[in-house]
Amino acid sequence: MRFRRNIERIGEIMAVEISKHLTYATEQVQTPLATAEVQVPQDKVVLGTILRAGLPLHQGFLNMYDHAENAFVSAYRKEVEDDHGNVQLEIVSEYLAAPSLENKTLMLVDPMLATGMSMEIAYKALLSHGTPSHLHLVCAFATPQAINYLQENIPQEATLWCAVIDPELNEKKYIVPGLGDAGDLCFGEKL
């Protein structure tokens, strides 16, 4: 699907930009013809994503950081009714697979940062596998509301990377103008 591939491309571009902020050391490498000095990244990178919508953005990063470890967290929206009959949005997470994050650089990627709640829940779930030395939160689309939410709810100093910041959310908490449900656009509608 074209949307899926375009999100992957955005991931590749953002991964290159973030690579400019990693730590490098000069090392000698032997080529078939001579010895050369090259800059080699020193950061131990873990690429984390939120299933299912985050997979294409994650793949874009993995194309650039092919030695990175991987982490996956499930998160989905669930509408719940409170005692007064008001419908509230709740984020549910039921699955986590991750390596140790202790003293590693975590790049947590998700294409849509609408409210910031999924990113917060994913990050806090991943902390059960250690504390990263640095956190990069990466999205293709974000809202000011989500950015403010993360600034208030992510305790660790983090770097936030957004390709586009759209102005608002609609009543269903989708980014406007945005693109809709990234998971559905990438992989088809949920059953």
Feature-to-residue mapping (PLM):
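PRPP-associated nucleotide enzymes
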Residues: 1-191
